[in-house]
Amino acid sequence: MMNLKQLAGEYAAGFVRDGMTIGLGTGSTVYWTIQKLGHRVQEGLSIQAVPTSKETEVLAKQLSIPLISLNEIDILDLTIDGADEINNDLQLIKGGGGALLREKIVATSSKELIIIADESKLVSHLGTFPLPIEIISFSWKQTEKRIQSLGCETHLRMKDSRPFITDNGNLIIDCIFPNKILNPNDTHTELKMITGVVETGLFINMKSKAIIGTKNGIKEY
């Protein structure tokens, strides 16, 4: 069976041109973009990249992709990243890999955001996939209760029987909204007003395009 993630990831690498400074997302689909870019760098492509996670940083270094800090530049030409859900308005849920804060910082520092995914990530309404929320660890139970007051079911993300810790030293609360997320803008705003919430996995109002791997080939949105 065709690997639809690989199809989308490698296709998106074609948007990267010589001399660009780009953002590299995190996850199983972007993995294929980074692999493709590594091959192109070996063939002479000259780029600089900002990784959105330690995982991506390690992979990029293994492939000899030159890395820089976001502090060294004003704006990125392009960021390529994956998504856990994509609705008809190209609003996203991201953060399944736990890198949502750095992913959002990099995405909002880019002229253009290309989202890559397989067709299973397309939805009419966001919210079937749990919405990740990054929170500080201090008094996290109080923050969780305030999040629950918005009508969602919450779970502290775990890894190896311990709380999952982000690259920023924070925790992740995964939230299920029983009636889906019908107004992502309002939900994002309400969550960000809760003290202790650092960032949400809702990526909205961004200049983006989506590259979707389907059984019939690539579709662009």
From Swiss-Prot:
CDD domains: RPI_A. It catalyses: aldehydo-D-ribose 5-phosphate = D-ribulose 5-phosphate. Its EC number is 5.3.1.6. GO terms for biological process: D-ribose metabolic process; pentose-phosphate shunt, non-oxidative branch. Catalyzes the reversible conversion of ribose-5-phosphate to ribulose 5-phosphate. Substrate binds at T26, G27, S28, T29, D81, G82, A83, D84, K94, G95, G96, G97, K121. Belongs to the ribose 5-phosphate isomerase family. Pathway: Carbohydrate degradation; pentose phosphate pathway; D-ribose 5-phosphate from D-ribulose 5-phosphate (non-oxidative stage): step 1/1. It comes from Bacillus mycoides (strain KBAB4). It is an enzyme of class 5 (isomerase). The active site is at E103 (proton acceptor). Keywords: Isomerase. This is Ribose-5-phosphate isomerase A. Pfam families: Rib_5-P_isom_A. One of its GO terms (cellular component) is cytosol. Homodimer. GO terms for molecular function: ribose-5-phosphate isomerase activity.
